Amino acid sequence: PAFYLDFKAYRAGDPNYKSTTRDVKRLLTELEKEKVDGVVIDLRNNGGGSLQEATELTGLFIDQGPTVLVRNSDGRVDVLADENTGIYYKGPLAVLVNRLSASASEIFAGAMQDYHRALILGGQTFGKGTVQTIQPLNHGELKLTLAKFYRVSGQSTQHQGVIPDIQYPDVMDTKEIGESALPEAL
């Protein structure tokens, strides 16, 4: 899934706003009724999305606790956490990743790995461990890096990504993909 959240409806207080976590929760309910043996979440080629959704989705699979740490440019560290007690889905879980899994995908996969909650399979992820915002300009936009995020383990994914528990080769050449391939990346 992409880590989407209908920000406009959410901020307006619409109780039916759309989000990744709500959709995954509904699908998990259906799968549990079918008595599946386990669930595979495919984050290959997933560029990320909402940091809030990455945290909330993680919360479906862990029993409360930090999901990601965000260090702002002033040095302040904010801890984003699942504050809901209980695990929504307790069954076996695998997460598929590749070099094009980035940002919120890495936050989710990293948290699942740090909590020993899922088996991470595939290739090393993109290595985007930063948080950006887009500022509109008169003739375009400017993307600003505001913060760096860290996994629950304290590791940064910047330039190194998430290393899967079980790696397998990718069908494409990934040497030139990712933050580490950019000469001036932070």
Predicted features along the sequence, with ranges:
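Cleft-lining beta-strand/loop regions that shape enzyme active-site pockets
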Residues: 1-138, 148
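Acidic, S/T/G-rich, low-cysteine, solvent-exposed domains in lumenal/extracellular/periplasmic regions
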Residues: 136-140, 160-162
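Short, small/polar residue-rich loop motifs at catalytic or cofactor-binding pockets
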Residues: 143-144
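Conserved functional hotspot residues or short segments at active or partner-binding sites
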Residues: 157-186
